[in-house]
């Protein structure tokens, strides 16, 4: 991650965002205090597959990854921008004094692929695209670095363990005049092709169990900040477009069966504008048909495909999503965190951040739906991914509730791939949100893999998500009580086994160290009456009718 990612408070202008409703999802008026929230599930409506890849992470403790059957892991972040597979060296960029670090044996790209292949986890591997990778460097202090004291004796800060390596700032202003070859060597798209060929030689092509997905660098519009010692200039439409098509072509030449993912922008500004334009479409956009950055990126990839006989060079349209909220857990912060998930889908929700009325007054983001609308217009058939996201507070029940809500939204909205950045520790509440979907009973049982219609009369109090499981046809219903009070709510189930019992699994503040298998609930004529504890996640499992 990058220091600039903090909360990205920049000026911007409004963006025309698509408004589209998904069948089976209603935006309801809040229920009154005296009215119980009602829930309904229709097992035959709004059916579509849920991609298992939405439950991914950028990394995870080994036992936890095995416990939840981690489906996909990403090798990326700022260090990947200048990673040199030939000498296993990367540069930390502005994250840590622009230092070249030789990766240990457990931190190489080969080790990452091996570890994840061995546990059945698909891999997303980032390839460099900025034009520079780390040169041969010492394995211990003193390191090669982008702003050495020998060139820049006056800086605001130096590495306490390496006094020659500075932060590249003086009086809070970025220094200029760094010499790229102090740390790096110039490369072009052929380097990415060599890297993919190397991994194919080690692990085979994607079609035979090799690396399945390659990412076109990381947050490129921030290169002139994160990696400003080698790339001080702002990224333009033409630079990113040219480097992306050339690198994608090199990847596809080295492994035609591999998928390509990009552009992996850091957030709102990079979704809509180039580095030259800043945080709103400007002169650079005007010179490219008036399209925002994401729209033009997709169109450029489609045009490149058309010029090469229709061959696909972009398989996943990827952006990063960090909600522009604080990281606190006070009541106001917790309430905002839970509301903010609506920016992923809700056409009535306007951002309560610098993006919203107090800032650029953007219309509702409905981010996943907007990404899908851009794809449908400019490069149909491209999948949609979010390879970095984090709502925070994973050490708190509020973070667990939010993550459970987010995972439910990902499945309902048809996202194809997601990998959390800054994954929870196994004992933290945030980890239990993943367990509720991926291992709720400790025996590997999972939430369903075919999304079905699930509607709440007040999604802000009780969020509900439904899915049918293909292996046994059971209906699974996830209910997230976002309130501080127990909620008694009737659930109606249509076009499924209307009588019998439902298993109940709950994670709540009553015991933050386990998922509790409670008493079964009666299902009578398609109705379940249940009370959902305050600040809880509850999974109901309804078995299919016996034939």
Regions found by a protein language model. Give the residues of each.
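C-terminal beta-strand-rich structural cap/linker in extracellular carbohydrate-active enzymes
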Residues: 521-547
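Active-site clefts of carbohydrate-active enzymes
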Residues: 221-228, 265-281, 346-357, 371-400
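N-terminal catalytic cores of secreted or lumenal carbohydrate-active enzymes
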Residues: 34-334
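Secretory targeting and sorting signals
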Residues: 2-33
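Glycoside hydrolase catalytic-domain groove-lining segments
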Residues: 245-253, 315, 321-390
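Glycan-recognition and catalytic regions of carbohydrate-active enzymes
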Residues: 396, 407-474, 498, 510
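Substrate-binding cleft of secreted/luminal carbohydrate-active enzymes
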Residues: 55, 303-306, 315-324, 389, ...
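Carbohydrate-binding surface patches
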Residues: 458-498, 538-541
């Amino acid at each position: 991650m990058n220091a600039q990612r903090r909360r990205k408070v920049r000026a911007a202008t409004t963006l025309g965002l698509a408004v589209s409703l998904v069948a089976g999802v209603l935006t309801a008026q809040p229920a009154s205090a005296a009215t119980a929230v009602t829930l309904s599930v229709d097992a035959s409506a709004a059916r579509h597959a849920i991609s298992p890849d939405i439950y991914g992470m950028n990394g995870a403790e080994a036992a936890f990854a095995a416990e939840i059957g981690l489906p996909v892991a990403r090798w990326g972040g700022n260090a990947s921008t200048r990673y040199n597979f030939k000498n296993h060296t990367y540069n930390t960029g502005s994250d840590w004094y622009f230092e070249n670090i030789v990766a240990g044996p457990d931190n190489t790209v080969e080790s990452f692929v091996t570890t994840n292949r061995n546990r059945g986890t698909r891999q997303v591997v980032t390839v460099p695209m900025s034009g520079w990778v780390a040169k041969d460097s010492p394995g211990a202090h003193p390191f090669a670095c982008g702003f050495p004291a020998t060139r820049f004796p006056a800086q605001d800060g130096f590495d306490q363990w390496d006094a020659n390596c500075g932060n590249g700032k003086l009086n809070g202003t970025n220094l200029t005049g760094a010499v790229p070859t102090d740390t790096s060597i110039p490369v072009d798209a052929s380097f990415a092709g060599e890297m993919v060929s190397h991994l194919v030689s080690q692990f085979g092509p994607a079609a035979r169990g090799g690396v399945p997905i390659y990412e076109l660098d990381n947050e490129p519009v921030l290169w002139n900040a994160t990696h400003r010692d080698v790339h001080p200039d702002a990224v333009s439409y033409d630079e990113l477009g040219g480097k992306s098509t050339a690198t994608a072509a090199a990847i596809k030449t080295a492994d035609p069966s591999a998928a390509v993912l990009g552009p992996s922008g850091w957030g709102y500004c990079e979704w809509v504008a180039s580095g030259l334009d800043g945080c709103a479409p400007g002169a650079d956009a005007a010179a490219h048909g008036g399209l925002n950055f994401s729209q033009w990126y997709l169109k450029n990839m489609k045009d490149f495909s058309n010029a090469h006989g229709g061959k696909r060079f972009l398989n996943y349209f990827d952006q990063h999503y960090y909600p522009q909220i604080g990281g606190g857990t006070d009541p106001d912060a917790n309430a905002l965190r839970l509301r903010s998930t609506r920016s992923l889908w809700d056409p009535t929700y306007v951002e309560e951040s610098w993006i919203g009325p107090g800032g650029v007054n953007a219309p509702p983001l409905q981010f996943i739906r907007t990404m899908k609308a851009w794809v449908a217009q400019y490069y149909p058939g491209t999948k949609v991914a979010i390879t970095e996201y984090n709502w925070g507070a994973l050490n708190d029940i509020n973070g667990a509730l939010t993550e459970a809500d987010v995972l439910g939204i990902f499945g309902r909205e048809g996202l194809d791939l997601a990998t959390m950045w800054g994954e929870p520790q196994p004992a933290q509440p945030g980890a239990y949100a993943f367990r509720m979907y991926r291992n709720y009973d400790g025996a590997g049982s999972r939430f369903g893999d075919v999304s079905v219609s699930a509607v709440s009369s007040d999604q802000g109090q009780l969020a509900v998500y439904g899915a049918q499981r293909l292996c046994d046809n059971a209906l699974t219903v996830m209910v997230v009580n976002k309130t501080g009070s127990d909620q008694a709510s009737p659930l109606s189930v249509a076009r499924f086994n209307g009588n019998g019992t439902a298993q109940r699994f709950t994670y709540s503040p009553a015991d933050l160290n386990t998922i509790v298998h409670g008493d079964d609930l009666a299902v009578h004529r398609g109705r379940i009456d249940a009370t959902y504890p305050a600040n809880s996640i509850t999974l109901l499992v309804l078995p299919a009718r016996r034939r």
